[in-house]
Amino acid sequence: MPAQTHISKLTLTNFRNYAALAIDLAPGAVVFSGDNGAGKTNLLEAISLLTPGRGLRRAPYADVAREGGDGGFALHARLDGPDGQVEIGTGISVGEGEGGRRVRINGATARSAEDMLEWLRVVWLTPAMDALFTGPAADRRRFLDRLVLAIDPGHGQRALDYEKAMRGRNRLLTDGSRDDRWFEAIETQMAETGVAIAAARAELVRLLAAMIDRLPDTGPFPQADISLSGDLEAEVSSAPAVDVEERFRRALAGGRDRDRAAGRTLEGPHRSDLLVRHRPKAMPAELCSTGEQKALLVGIVLSHARLTGEMSGMTPILLLDEIAAHLDGGRRAALFSILEELNCQAFMTGTDAALFSSLMGRAQFLTVDHGTVGPTEDA
């Protein structure tokens, strides 16, 4: 069984509506309840920033820093894991811009935010993701890449490198440049990183599909059939990566006039999509009811949590924002049971603590009240 990694203490300074907060946390289920706008999701956002990226809201750091503060913010977490305790801190100082985020691990400055993935993996579900299957493909790619990152820590940097190269190519296209050497250099980098991204996505989908197949087909959360739509993802499953890179590089070179007319790059992993079907109903997820879509999404995340534990040797930390609002009583009880079985730390939020009543005695209940957090009465 994977070793549990959990946050035992979380400290926030000038973060969102928290001027200063320090809370001790239990290793299993943690329930944050309180009124809308009290700051429950802010706590989940803080935890989500203990991994690379902009967190579950994808907000600019200027928005994350507390209004009325000095413009900076700091987060600190004490982790208890298989290798003992680890201290992780991140934030920005006063006057630092969007690129000024710093990470410290056990007091030492980390090389990059990716170093945090050595110590914890975090995956989240938020109400904004309820429209994942009916919304734009970009949202599904972002969700997929977050799942990949949890088992392949290098994926985030590859995605950043690809995006940077593509922005450079798009600038050349819109500027009307005909400098073949510049194009060739950028397109070579796009081919290398783009194929690596596609291969990582394809591998994640293969592994996750196999994990879903291992689970009972009569469970509370319907099994999903998942696949990828994209030329590169299809090719890397059947051809050597070096051959796919060369094909993609030639396609980029041959498509310059087309892309110049469009003003952007029209081929690559940034155009791919994650396809999901409700297996029992043999129906595309986007055609399912809202409740069925939510159940499918929860099932995928729980299967991914199992996969992450097996692949990394540590249980992921789950952030489940307003998770109980759209699940019936049976599925809520099933979710809580599965979380216990996974032995992972799971942070859940809701306006009504009663929705989590079946967890009484088995979870830590905390009430959030506009900048303060304390034990929930009668919990």
Curated annotation (Swiss-Prot):
Annotated positions binding ATP: G34, D35, N36, G37, A38, G39, K40, T41
Q: Which GO terms describe its cellular component?
A: cytoplasm
Keyword set, alphabetical order: ATP-binding, Cytoplasm, DNA damage, DNA repair, DNA replication, DNA-binding, Nucleotide-binding, SOS response
The principal localisation class reads cytoplasm
Biological processes annotated in GO: DNA replication; DNA synthesis involved in DNA repair; double-strand break repair; SOS response
Q: Where in the cell is it found?
A: Cytoplasm
Highest taxon, organism lineage: Bacteria
Molecular functions (GO terms): ATP binding; ATP hydrolysis activity; single-stranded DNA binding
Q: Does the keyword DNA repair apply?
A: yes
What InterPro entries does the database record attribute to this sequence?
AAA+_ATPase, DNA-binding_RecF, DNA-binding_RecF_CS, P-loop_NTPase, RecF/RecN/SMC_N, RecF_2
Q: Which family does it belong to?
A: Belongs to the RecF family.
The job of this chain, per UniProt, is described as: The RecF protein is involved in DNA metabolism; it is required for DNA replication and normal SOS inducibility. RecF binds preferentially to single-stranded, linear DNA. It also seems to bind ATP.
**Record protein name field:** DNA replication and repair protein RecF
